[in-house]
Amino acid sequence: MKQYIKNNIQYPYSLITHGIRISVKTNFLEDQSDEDKNLWVWSYHILIENNRPETVQLIDRYWKITDETGHINEVKGAGVIGQQPIINPKNSFQYSSGTPLSRPSGFMDGAYNMIYEGNKSLKVIIPTFSLDNPLTKIILN
């Protein structure tokens, strides 16, 4: 997967589905992580770019969060960060969120359900991205 740069921000993970580009960058949050409590926390920043000729609206999301042992946690919900953003053609929406793991490494992927032209539906894939602890010597992903 090729890195993507937008406004001088480097996104290591980027994918285009149906003319919608989803780009992701992550950050390990050492200050919120606690190995003694089996807690490792990451933030992720998502950039959604609408390269379609029509306006789209993000309706809901699906995440599959997998830790290094293969344990999977699935998350479904309306919108993102309490919003169901409307994204006009050639415009973008970005947000940041986070996720904890009970292991020091893992990865996430998923999809957004979007609508356009009133009620036509699009499934937009979120690229798989790595959640690796930079303090760990062995990187799995």
Where are these regions (language model features)?
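Beta-strand signatures of extracellular beta-sandwich domains
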Residues: Y62-K64
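Membrane engagement elements in two modes
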Residues: M1-V41, P53-Q57, T66-N141
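Acidic, contiguous internal or C-terminal segments within carbohydrate-active enzymes
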Residues: W42-L47
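Asparagine-centered strand-capping/turn motif at beta-strand->loop junctions
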Residues: I48-R52
